[in-house]
């Protein structure tokens, strides 16, 4: 088979199963409204949960820092790209989440890959929730360690896997809030089991940080859990982009030596780091608390209004509200029907989710109003699917 034939066959297979992904060009993609092709839609696909991507204080911080530092960092943090803005943000994050250290990464994907790749060796084992993010599972598959997956949120299965003999070290991997199902992991029980088997715990709290817990400290804080490795990302609750790993002093020093994504990547722009510090200040403030409370009320309003006889609504109380429709083509038709009525929603299909669980992944944000939720419910129930 030629290279071209391989490419063509893969694309043909995706088209045949209604799983071909595509991008949409938008004029505005974050916030209450999405604008595409000159039309305005209520936006139910954004990760900007607290509406901070449009916050004037954060925008101003980025602009002022860009004037001071320029638009790029100029190098890896190990060469010339670790500015006072980066250092300040790392200190603020560590103090906020009560960890000895925080290390910045250019993305959550990079952070997860870097940590797992740097830590795991040939005789080690990774035990990951089977619905863990692609960045975690890909890193685990690429590492020399053995990967075992436990049934989603099934702590008994996790315990059985950890009990089997392992010559090296074991790492338990889970998310705080799951990106496709919107539910939360039983973190306290998972941590208890991990410690009983002398395993370390890595929690990716991309969808919880900033949005849940006291001062937005996330799912782990809310559950009274402190994993050895906490990954937080900044493209959701923070409204910007990037990520950080919270850990001990020695692990931070280790990652600075062996995390290749950190050593060999140009660091995020200093202006971005300063904008993230401004975002953190909003998240920790009374305004941040009010934004979280409003979002929680909108989620409750949506869940109370969904017709459960027509849609499978998962046990998700986060900003992520998936409606399971099962069939790929039905999910695509439903998403298109919503767009025709002015509501932008995304159909999620395999391989992102398991076969037979195609869904509308609806995300609610603080930027929405109660009338927006009511309109979404009206359109959903009249979609004819």
Curated annotation (Swiss-Prot):
Binding, pyridoxal 5'-phosphate: 108-109, 179, 207, 233
GO BP annotation list: biotin biosynthetic process
Modified residues annotated as N6-(pyridoxal phosphate)lysine in this record: 236
EC number, as in UniProt: 2.3.1.47
Keyword terms of this UniProt record: Biotin biosynthesis, Pyridoxal phosphate, Transferase
InterPro entries: Aminotrans_II_pyridoxalP_BS (IPR001917), Aminotransferase_I/II_large (IPR004839), AON_synthase_class-II (IPR050087), AONS_Archaea/Proteobacteria (IPR004723), AONS_Proteobacteria (IPR022834), PyrdxlP-dep_Trfase (IPR015424), PyrdxlP-dep_Trfase_major (IPR015421), PyrdxlP-dep_Trfase_small (IPR015422)
Catalytic activity: 6-carboxyhexanoyl-[ACP] + L-alanine + H(+) = (8S)-8-amino-7-oxononanoate + holo-[ACP] + CO2
Binding-site list for substrate: 21, 133, 352
Cofactor(s) recorded in Swiss-Prot or TrEMBL: pyridoxal 5'-phosphate
Molecular function (Gene Ontology), one example: pyridoxal phosphate binding
UniProt pathway annotation: Cofactor biosynthesis; biotin biosynthesis
Enzyme class: transferase
NCBIfam families attached to this UniProt entry: bioF (TIGR00858)
Family: Belongs to the class-II pyridoxal-phosphate-dependent aminotransferase family. BioF subfamily.
Subunit field text: Homodimer.
UniProt name for this protein: 8-amino-7-oxononanoate synthase
Gene source species: Salmonella newport (strain SL254)
